[in-house]
């Protein structure tokens, strides 16, 4: 809520014309009682997790709230049959490899470059042909590190680290998972 104080400072002007709904996530306990004024400045708080819903219900029980799961389509993101997995891995030269998948924004706070350094240390122990790291991200994000430069600097240019930077369909993303 701290990023939107300006909005809640004018909530009486907004709510006179339209309801205010806050789509919210809060990740941990203890209850953030200091958020009560912000929660109560909404007509509804839509909570992304059960924990968030519990927080809102306990910090501001008088505000209307609901739990709206932050989730994926279970018809797309579901377990595959072993034969389909084997075929997918084989088509990408991932047979008999330990595969790690990182699906994230390449932002410094996400430690994307550090992950590659750690992965190299892992490969140095198990063998560079035994594992692959797939990173679904923008390798040259202005808020991140130059991941391509890092893999070159570390000598990880033989398929140890693979990048998937294009926008992909949910089905294609589910396949990687």
Where are these regions (language model features)?
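Conserved donor-binding/catalytic core segment of Leloir-type glycosyltransferases
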Residues: 94-110, 116-119, 133-134
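A short helix/loop element that forms part of the nucleotide-sugar donor recognition site in Leloir-type
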Residues: 78-93
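Short hydrophobic "strand-cap" motifs at the C-terminus of beta-strands
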Residues: 23, 48, 68, 102-104, ...
């Amino acid at each position: 809520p701290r990023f939107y104080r300006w909005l809640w400072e004018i909530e009486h002007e907004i709510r006179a014309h339209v309801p205010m709904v806050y789509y919210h996530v809060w990740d941990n306990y203890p209850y953030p009682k200091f958020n009560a004024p912000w929660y109560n400045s909404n007509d509804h708080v839509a909570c992304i997790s059960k924990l968030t819903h519990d927080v809102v219900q306990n910090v501001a029980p008088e505000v209307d709230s609901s739990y709206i799961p932050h989730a994926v389509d279970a018809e797309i993101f579901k377990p595959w049959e072993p034969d389909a997995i084997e075929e997918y891995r084989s088509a990408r030269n991932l047979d008999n490899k330990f595969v790690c998948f990182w699906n994230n924004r390449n932002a410094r706070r996400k430690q994307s470059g550090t992950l590659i350094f750690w992965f190299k240390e892992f490969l140095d122990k198990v063998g560079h042909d035994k594992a692959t790291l797939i990173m679904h991200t923008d390798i040259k994000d202005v808020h991140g590190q130059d991941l391509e430069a890092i893999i070159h600097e570390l000598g990880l240019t033989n398929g140890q680290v693979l990048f998937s930077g294009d926008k992909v369909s949910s089905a294609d993303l589910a396949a990687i998972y």
